[in-house]
Amino acid sequence: MILANDELKRLISLGRLKVEPLAPDTVRENGLDLRIGGEYAIYAYEGAVVKPCELDSARPLFRVVKADEVVIPPRNFVLLTTEEYVKMPDDVVGLANLRSTLARYGLVIPPTVVDAGFEGNITIEVVNESPNTIVLRRGMRFLHLILVKAEGRALYSGTYQGQRGVTPPKGLRGEC
């Protein structure tokens, strides 16, 4: 069941769902609109051979940029972080979607689940499929998070729990 505006506000008022900072236009009809944070990550090298199964961390492959503008080159991608620090209830799952206006410029994100019990800034991959450089601004609403009630409870305890700022991917050594 998708949670609507009144239920989202109720969960926030009870402290079960936390969104900090909480702007007046964050809670929407059927989800949360989240803003671009103050940093992003982009690959530091072009043409490198990346072998996730041999990495403990991919952080050295990325350059973290602190800026008020996010520059996304044509047919490239960046990792964006939300301005908001989110704490999900243990029985609610988030489904992340790019706001449709940005998709109309040629930006896309992969299907992304924010697990029940997750806490942290959300890092999301944004791909520019267009032939043009696209520049986004810090603080603009970019991510629409649909919240869905889960059957039962879960507690997320993964690598990205408690992340602050943009977080490059973990390595997959030992998982392949």
Curated annotation (Swiss-Prot):
One Gene Ontology term of the molecular function aspect: nucleotide binding
E.C. no: 3.5.4.13
Presence of keyword Phosphoprotein: no
Keywords: Hydrolase, Nucleotide metabolism, Nucleotide-binding
CDD domains, A to Z: trimeric_dUTPase (cd07557)
Claim: Hydrolase is one of the keywords in the record: yes
Active site: 125 (proton donor/acceptor)
Reactions this protein catalyses: dCTP + H2O + H(+) = dUTP + NH4(+)
Binding site for dCTP: 99-104, 115, 163
Function per UniProt: Catalyzes the deamination of dCTP to dUTP.
Assembly information from the UniProt record: Homotrimer.
Listed name of the protein: dCTP deaminase
Native species: Pyrobaculum neutrophilum (strain DSM 2338 / JCM 9278 / NBRC 100436 / V24Sta) (Thermoproteus neutrophilus)
